[in-house]
Amino acid sequence: MSTVVAQALHVFGLRPHVTNNVFFFDEQIIIFPSGNHCVKYNIDQKWQKFIAGSDKSQGMLALAISPNRRYLAISETVQEKPAVTIYELSSIPCRKRKVLNNFDFQVQKFTSMAFSPDSKYLLTQTSPPDSNLVYWLWEKQKVMAIIKADSQNNPIYQVSISSQDNSQVCITGSGVFKLLRFAEGTLKQINFQRGESSNYLAHAWVSEDRVIVGTDTGKLFLFESGDQRWETSIMVKESTSSRSLEVIQESESLIEFPPLSSPVSSVERMDITTNTQQQAMPQVFAIAAYSKGFACSAGPGRVLLFEKVEEKDFYRESREIRIPTDQQSNDPSQSDKQDVLCLCFSPSEETLIASTNKNQLYSITMSLTEISKGEAAHFEYLLYPLHSASITGLDTCIRKPLIATCSLDRSVRIWNYESNTLELYKEYQEEAYTVSLHPSGHYIVVGFADKLRLMNLLIDDIRPFKEYSVRGCKECSFSNGGHLFAAVNGNVIHIFTTTSLENINILKGHTGKIRSLVWNLDDSKLVSAGTDGAVYEWNLSTGKRETECVLKSCSYNSVTTSPDAKVIFAVGSDQTLKEISDSLILREIPAFDVIYTSITISHSGRMIFVGTSVGTIRAMKYPLSLQKEYNEYQAHAGPVMKMLLTFDDQFLLTVGEDGCLFTWKVFDKDGRGIKREREVGFAEEVLVTKTDMEEKAQIMLELKTRVEELKMENEYQLRLKDMNYTEKIKELTDKFIQEMESLKTKNQVLKTEKEKQDISHRERLEELVDKQTRELQDLECCNNQKLLLEYEKYQELQLKSQRMQEEYEKQLRDNDETKSQALEELTEFYEAKLQEKTGLLEEAQEDVRQQLREFEETKKQIEEDEDREIQDIKTKYERKLRDEKESNLRLKGETGIMRKKFSSLQKEIEERTNDIELLKSEQMKLQGIIRSLEKDIQGLKREIQERDETIQDKEKRIYDLKKKNQELEKFKFVLDYKIKELKKQIEPRENEIKVMKEQIQEMEAELERFHKQNTQLELNITELLQKLRATDQEMRKEQQKERDLEALVRRFKTDLHNCVAYIQEPGLLKEKIRGLFEKYVQRADMVEIAGLNSDLQQEYARQREHLERNLATLKKKVIKEGELHRTDYVRIMQENVSLIKEINELRRELKLTRSQIYDLESALKVSKKTRSQEVPESVISKDVVGSTSTMRLNEQEETGRIIEMQRLEIRRLRDQIQEQEQVPGFHTIAGVRLPSIVDSDVDFEVHTK
């Protein structure tokens, strides 16, 4: 066994074509089939547990759960044999309880099943032509009863047992409705159909003997004990959205044109429409009963709830539930047109689950249906939108935990394997064949039937930004670095770059369709494999094959490489896994009777996983073993289409033809996860376009304004309500006060009455007590008397029993005496018999002795007779012996002769055997050659068949396109007429629109001008405000200075006034004046004024030096740039001169070739004149000239193309030079001048003429 273990972790998908495919295990857990498993899914906690199907199972057909929810029955086909497996759901993990697979009757498969109410019995229905209904006691694997359900082999859709009675059984089918009762080991029909039979699709028990039955014409019947009690017809109702869409479509066009992508012809389309009109009746595919009534499907996307009318035997429609339209669908009006195939209520009847024919699960809370009165309620997705067809593409990325899948249901989906959710999905008009996810997780490449599209993964959308005309691309893959991606077109590989989005390489070499691509780790090589049996390794730098391994007998399905890219692993149709290295097959590991469909290897190179055609996966350890050393796991219900490992080797991802996606956790044998440390966590960034952000910002603004408005409205409403409620409260308080007063009076009255009643009750109680005491005394007296009587009777009975005991003892003694007498008599009787038998025995012994004596005498006589006979025989054989000896001598001579002949013949035989061995070896060689040739023939036949198919497809496509063209030409006239009318209607509106647009542009210009003016004015205002603040500060400083000066002047005046008093005394006056000078005039002021002037001069000189230095550096930069531009210009001029020289040389060659052509043409004219004279010579010369002329013409075309390319290059370079000349500071060199292209063009045209 392998040491690699995979454990199923989560599944995205619902298995189709299973009867009763969803159940509730409890309020939170549901059970549904997915792949080759049944899944227990917790709705609240979002976990899944798996119940694996049987080994080598070919598919589940039907499910059934017991009423006590302990057992689950699964009908499946195991190794082409039907079987019913019953699991015990209460055990963890769920274990098999019983397997019903030994049958005494013919059975192909079980199509429907049901448990009895007590879960002891199981009812199963087999498929036609047997159509047996079997009633099992399943725990003992015993068939209790079996009956043929329908003698006409009509299909049976559903069987069930009554919800309260084990013995009542109901079956419904095409023209079949039977009620049966199990009694005395048989099933007997208790109802008989009257009138026309219908196609009964579903039924449900609503009570012990009542059944609701639905038909394909939208009718519901209620049967009670086989008699019809009620009937109704479901009316077709369309949702408002679909009606509005139809009205719009009718108003847009009176004639319906077929879509361009539809290959169906108009006649076939009419047939389809008639069929759809016939099938417009709502078909009742599912019915589920609950306590209030029942729910039933009523046509596409519609479920009706019926409730029982009280005290009557019929039901009325109470609610309608619809499947919502899917806005991500390519046709939202048709997305809700799904048939509901199964309905299921939770145990508390709080939730209803529905499954549809498009493999979707929907749920609804029943309380919501009661809230939505008048309008139809809508289902919600129980999980998320799932794939409804085969998944064809799978990929994952490095930077995010994302999985990308695409399917034949025309959808692309992005899943998150970390949170097990659906991130994005979108449906398209074309089928998607392959998908590849960029390592960053921001882009995907999808191959559609019409084109290859490169798309962005936005936050809520998948939006294409580049399309390539690669039709029907079945394989594509991003490189590990993400800078390249490869796409397959039939047998050709295109390599595109993600930077310039151009096709940089085309790899050709395969002769068949390419099935698989894989890049090596450094993206330098690409490995491809296809149906032609070829595995190629391409070198992308050269575009050539480096290694190749071709085995035409094998059609490869998948390929992968080891991490070091030295070994290639390939799987295909020959049931082997091949190890290829250096173009040689190193080993072939057998697949043991299955075909490997896909393969992947871990990034560590130690684990290999392969998917098989029967839906299983195998985990192997590398290096591989030739023995069965692998672990095999049940996975899908069909071939595994794709599989891969995540970048950290933690999870295995697989997709299948059944439309399911599995995620597996990978472990080693000890249960440890294979750890690869992530250096960086998963990225959380998403792509959002600028327009989306602006729209969302606008929406947010609008919503904010709306919220403000609503707040205002709510406040106003609240104030109104407060006023109303205060008034009501006042009214109620007044009312309640009045009522309280009235109640108080009533209470007083009642108290008085109560007191009266208490008095009367006391009197009555006293009377009753007296009466009871009297009765008790009477009873005691009676009981005493009865006791005395009973005691007397007891004594009498005791005496009787003593007497009877004495009698019985006497009888026992008598019996013992009689017994001993009887024993003595018997012994005497048997002793007499014994004596008689001994006498008889002695007589018999004497007879035996007499017989022995007689035997001895007869023996002697026989011996004597035998001796005589022996003597006679002896003489006879002696005579014969003599004769034989004579003949023996004669034969010895003959044998000598024959021995010589034998030796010669033996030599011949040895020679012949040697010849035969040589021929056998030649035959083996020839057989090997024949086998290889047969394999080649088969491969060629397959190739021819595939090419024929492609040719037929293309011819069919051409035919369909021709038909479409004819139809479109028919409708062209009508469309032209409509276009003219619409143009007439549109012209005035367009003029108005133009006028309005001009007005809007003018207004926008004015608005921009006003905005600019406003900004300029705001700037001016800020500048002025700053200036104002500065002037205010200066003004305050000046005012302060002014105040200081005024104070100084006042002080000076006072001091001067004091000095005036000494005017008559000069000496004192002089001293006072000197004191004033010293007080008011200071030397520091003078020094400060001089210092300020010197500082200003220094600052000015410093700034000047700085500006001069900057100017010098800028001059140097300008000179350097000019020199650089000059060198570039000289180089370009030199290139142009060389190119013009080449052109002139090519023109000279062209002129020579033309002159040669002219000479040859003149020679031809001469040869035409002399044709009649020399016919054969002229023919030869004509052939020669024709061949030379064709050669010359081809050369002429080639030279013309070269000249055209050179001319375009020269023009491009001239434009480049002009752009360079327009750059400021760039000057042309006066010495260099190019020859004019115009003159050369004129010369060229003259020569050509």
UniProtKB/Swiss-Prot annotation:
One protein family per Pfam: Beta-prop_EML_2
Coiled-coil region(s): 690-1056, 1094-1165
Keyword set includes Oxidoreductase: no
Record key words, sorted: Cell projection, Coiled coil, Cytoplasm, Cytoskeleton, Repeat, WD repeat
Location of the protein in the cell: Cytoplasm, Cytoskeleton, Cilium axoneme
WD repeat start-end pairs: 105-148, 195-233, 335-374, 386-425, 427-469, 471-506, 509-548, 635-674
Keyword match Nucleotide-binding: no
Main location, first listed in the record: cytoplasm
Protein name per UniProt: Cilia- and flagella-associated protein 57
